[in-house]
Amino acid sequence: MLDKQLLDILVCPVCKGTLSVDKGHTELVCDKDKLAFPVRDDIPVMLMEEARKLEADDA
């Protein structure tokens, strides 16, 4: 599980907007840019190269 304090300070590296945790706690999602950043071993990977573009059915 991700640390609440860490989630409070993390922002999207593209737009600097807020991130939300997906239901499975496996990704951090930027709704504005429609990007999902993976969480591996409870560590967010905030690299654009690792981000997944969200499809319409992912929302």
From Swiss-Prot:
This protein's GO CC annotations: cytosol
Domain of life according to the entry: Bacteria
InterPro entries xrefs: Trm112-like
Pfam families per record: Trm112p (PF03966)
Family: Belongs to the UPF0434 family.
Record-linked HAMAP family: UPF0434
Protein name: UPF0434 protein Mmc1_0910
Organism, as annotated: Magnetococcus marinus (strain ATCC BAA-1437 / JCM 17883 / MC-1)
